Each structure stands twice: as C-alpha cells, then as structure tokens.
Design a protein with these regions (language model features):
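Detector for intrinsically disordered, low-structure N-terminal pre-sequences
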Residues: 2-3, 98, 563
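A detector of low-complexity, intrinsically disordered, Ser/Thr/Gly/Pro/Ala-rich segments
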Residues: 12-13, 412, 555
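Beta-strand-rich ligand- or partner-binding modules
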Residues: 21-460
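Beta-sandwich/jellyroll recognition modules and their flexible linkers
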Residues: 3, 225-226, 552
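Bacterial N-terminal signal peptides
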Residues: 7-16
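Short loop/turn motifs at secondary-structure boundaries
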Residues: 404, 455-568
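Positively charged n-region of N-terminal signal peptides that target proteins for export
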Residues: 1-6, 568
Length: 568
C-alpha cells in the first residue's frame, strides 16, 4: 500500500515549533488531491468537480458495465466451461471481453448443441439502471442470441448468496426477469425497464444457435447508493497527537436522504498490520475529536457516502485535521480503587507513568462527577506543589514542567455515578500550543493492584435516581440576596445516554405551582434552582412545598420527593 505525505510533512515539521499544532488538509486546493491519496475508490468521482470528493453519479449514455472488473466485480459462466471445453483461465479471459470495450473481441458460444449457457455479471457496485444492451461484433452480425432470458439482482436481496457462489448456479429466484424472448431477430438487443438499483445481471441463452457477445452494456442515471473512499496511510513523519477533524460538505437532493460516514484508524507501521488500531466509531459531525489512538505516526481515513435515492447525494470539498508532536514517548495509567459504592465520595489514586516527557505540566482527568477535594500530587514519590481547577465532571491539575521519565500520582475525592466509569486522562503542556496527549490504560505502578482506568459500582436493581438534596431546607425569596433560592441536587446513575428529567414544585394540596426547565440528562450530578416563583412569574405564598424529581428510562419512571419551606 502506498504512503502519502512523508516528504511534505517532514518538511513541515522542521519549520514548525517543537510542539506547534498544525492542520493537515486533504483535497480542496491546499493539500494532496483526493485522487493522489486514494488507496481504494471504486465508485468515487474525481473528475466532475476538481478538488471535490463525491460518489459516482450515472450520466445519460454512460455505460456503467465498463470498469466492472476494476471495481472488484466479475463475469462468470457456471456452465460454459463444460460446454466449451475451455480451461478456467481461458474462460475467464474470454468472459472478460463482454465488458472490455474492445469491439474486436467477444465471448463466443459456437458449434455446440447445448442450450442454457448463461453468464452472470457483477458490476462491482450498485447503480441506477433502466436499460441493458448486448450485441455481437459488427463482422459477426448474424451470431446474435436467438433466444434469451435477462434478469437482475439489486445487490441487496440474496446478494450475499450470489456473491458467495459466482462459480455455481445462482438461484434464479434471487433474480428478477426484466426481459426475455424466444424468437429474437435483432442483432442488438435493448432491454428497457423502470429505473432501479442493479448490481448483478444474469443473461441466459435459450436457443441452440451460434452466438457471441461483443459488449454487455448497462445505462441509467442517478447517484450510486453506496460509495466508499479509502486513503492510503497518511504519514505524519513522527509519532503524532490527533486533534479535531473537519470537512466541508455539500448536499444534493432531499434533506436527510444522504449521509457521510467517516472513520479513522492509526498505526506506527507504513503497511496495515495487526499493530494498527481497529476502525473508530463513526465521526458524527464536522469538528469532532479524532478517537483513534495516539501518538501514532500514520493515520488512515475511510469515507463512506450513503444515499436513499437516485437524486440524493453528498460531496465534500476538503478534509482537515489537527495534529502535533507527542508530549511523551509513551504513557501507562491506572486508578485505584476500582470498585466503590455508587454515589459516595471516595478517595482515588490516579497514577501515570510517563516515558520521554517533554515539557508536560498538567494532567486532566475526566471523573463524570465533581471532584470534592485534591489531597496530594506526587512525582516519583515526592510531594510537589500543584494548582487545581476542579470542574463539574473532572479535574485539571498543574505542576512544574517535566522532562524525561516520571511517575505521577494524584489523590482526589469524587463519586462514581454509573456502573462502569472510565476515568480518562490527558497530559498537557501549557507552554506550547500542542494538543493534549491521552494516557493509555495499563500497569503504571506495582504500588497499586489495578491496571486500567475503569471504576465499577454494584448493580442493585435499576434505581437511577439517588441522593436528592435541597439546600437550604428553608429560603426567603424576597430579593435581598440572602437565601433567595433553593438548590436541588440529585445524582443520575447507570445511564449510557441522556433521558428526560423533570423537576416540579407542588403545594400541599397537590397542585403544581412551578415546573423547572425539563431537560435530557445523562449519568452525573445535576443541579436545578427554584427562586420561589410560580409558572406565571408570581412569588408563591409562604408555606411548605414539595419538590418532585422525575426521570423517564426504558425501565420505567422513577420519582423522588423532598420538602422545602418558603418563609418571609
């Protein structure tokens, strides 16, 4: 497999600062062309819009059978070998003539007495087709097919059976007949039918006469329903951190009827092997963080176009992604303990072993819940000074810039709110504009018994709403700036995606007086505030009120209530 970018990127690295973040642009007018960077692009159009990447669209009068073999398609005849007494290689060579565009060659079935010889053409992709034509060479006009049955398969229904058994007798029931004639008198056969997706064509002779096919041609219109583009491994010249990826899309046809699916994988070898990462989950939109492992030297993109209709398509002008040199040669990180009670603040030790640090002065840890306290930071077993920036779902801890090999260990208190929480971490170098470097889970130190970054909690039933608390228990919304509102805190546990949560205020008669803004919320610690006003904006009378928290999950509705006093 070819590799793109080594000379270009090595030059860029020499003129850039050591930790500078940069952008790699593919396509458009600024970077390597889409065609230059292509490893596979069987039904991609590079020509109609220079600099753009788009799926092939069938134009009127263009024969889509041409190029079938180059796209990975085939032409086979499961029963011709016995009839014609040809070797496998010679038969394959002769069958290929029906799509080679050479009018001096043909596939011939002559001087035999058998009927029912048929061939199957795989276009290598699905196309919108409404017209199929076949004919003999001009110098053999009388050797046309005197009887035939033509049928097609759309590449979806039973297509796996057809594709898996091209050298056997494909089941006729998997094909739909679009044309047949027992007494054909035309040398050029044109079969026309309603526009539809076609991938496989089955053509059978039903008469005992000499015949040949110069070309089997298919015509139609519209975008192919699926098209995939695969880059060669893009060489960044050295171990690299990945940033965000963006692209400039353009849609043709109906909104929502065409899609773009982009995945990445990374490695350190120029050829794809077992050391490369698997394909990432699809990137859901432009300006999303690349999730494939780093630092790695090479990255590969797979871009898939999908369309729900012949007139619906999508194109992209260019694709760019951020990258910067690695902040460390390698990392290993683990957390302890790895099994705790749900929703209870626990002291954790987060250890990171760093090899080849180059100016690292920060560690960011995702916890999923607020960090209550940072207790200490140790570098190589020695307590050191640090700064902290706690957040609602994590912690940023800063320290003096580090070079070389070190073991970092930070102790902090937080709660775990879902069954398996991964405490991902990133190394930072604030003295540069380098991208963060994600730490890799592993055995960072023998002082901790774990070897990964996952923390689990016991699963006891399906309760997802915990620790509903009101602060203060009584408040006076009189506008003096003191105790003017109540803060409603609650934990949502065990969820893998956001679900509807509502917070309502009721008086003691059961009448709802206020609904706080409903929202979809995932696992985490959440806060709502009530300022003592009803839904009409009026201050409620003094008295006791019920705060009602309700959450909707696929296991049903869960509720919890607390009381609060409004006083003046």
């Amino acid at each position: 497999m070819r590799v793109v970018g080594r000379a270009l990127l090595c030059l860029c690295c020499t003129i850039a600062s050591l930790h500078a973040a940069d952008d790699f642009v593919l396509g458009g007018t600024l970077g390597p062309s889409w065609e230059e960077a292509a490893a596979e692009a069987p039904v991609i159009d590079f020509d109609s819009r220079p600099g753009w990447l788009l799926p092939r669209s069938v134009q009127t009068g263009i024969n889509v059978a041409a190029g079938s073999l180059e796209r990975g398609g085939f032409v086979v005849s499961p029963n011709a070998q016995a009839v014609l007494r040809l070797s496998t290689s010679v038969l394959a060579e002769q069958l290929a003539r029906v799509v080679d565009g050479n009018h001096d060659t043909a596939f011939e079935v002559k001087d035999v007495v058998a009927t029912g010889v048929f061939l199957v053409l795989d276009l290598g992709a699905r196309f919108g087709v409404d017209h199929i034509s076949f004919f003999p060479r001009a110098s053999f006009r009388t050797d046309f097919m005197k009887g035939y049955v033509m049928s097609v398969n759309d590449g979806v229904f039973g297509a796996d059976i057809v594709a898996a058994s091209p050298d056997k007798l494909p089941n006729r029931s998997l094909f739909t007949i679009v044309g047949q004639e027992q007494g054909n008198s035309r040398d050029t056969v044109d079969v026309r039918f309603p526009l539809q997706y076609v991938r496989y064509v089955r053509l059978e002779s039903t008469q005992r006469f000499n015949w040949e096919i110069d070309e089997l041609e298919l015509f139609g219109r519209g975008f192919v329903p699926e098209a995939e583009y695969l880059t060669v491994p893009l060489d960044l010249g050295r171990p690299t951190l990945w940033g965000r990826v963006g692209w400039a899309p353009e849609r043709t046809g109906r909104e929502g009827k065409s899609r773009l699916v982009i995945r990445t994988r990374t490695g350190d070898a120029p050829e794809i092997d077992d050391s490369w990462s698997p394909w990432s989950a699809p990137l859901t939109g432009s300006d999303e963080q690349i999730q494939s492992p780093s630092p790695r030297r090479y990255i590969q993109y797979r871009i898939r176009f999908e369309s729900d209709g012949l007139e619906d398509g999508m194109a992209i002008d260019s694709l760019s992604f951020g990258h910067s040199p690695a902040l460390a040669t390698s990392t290993l990180a683990e957390v302890w303990p790895q099994s705790v009670e749900v929703g209870q603040d626990t002291t954790f030790t987060y250890a990171v072993r760093i090899a080849g640090a180059n100016g690292i002065d920060g560690l960011q840890i995702d916890t999923g819940a607020p960090v209550v306290q940072v207790r200490s930071l140790r570098i190589d077993g020695v307590d050191v000074a640090y700064t902290t920036e706690p957040g609602d779902t994590g912690l940023l801890i800063g320290f003096a810039p580090q070079q070389g090999d070190h073991l970092l260990a930070v102790d902090f208190d937080t709660a775990v709110l879902r069954y398996e929480t991964v405490l991902e971490g990133r190394l930072l170098a604030s003295g540069s504009d380098s991208l963060p470097q994600r730490v890799v889970a592993g055995d960072a130190t023998t002082q901790l018994p774990g070897n990964d970054l996952s923390v689990r909690v016991p699963l006891r039933g399906f309760d997802v709403l915990h620790n509903v608390e009101l602060t203060p228990g009584a408040f006076s919304p009189n506008g003096d700036g003191v105790n003017d509102e109540v803060v409603i805190a609650y934990d949502v546990l065990h969820l893998t995606q956001a679900v509807p949560v509502a917070v309502d205020i009721f008086d003691l008669s059961g009448r709802r007086v206020a609904r706080l803004s409903p929202a979809d919320e995932a696992s985490g610690r959440h806060l709502s505030r009530w300022d003592g006003h009803d839904d009409d904006g009026n201050i409620v009378p003094p008295g006791l009120y019920l705060v009602h928290v309700e959450i909707e999950t696929d296991q049903g509705t869960q509720r919890s209530s607390r009381s609060v006093c409004v006083a003046y």
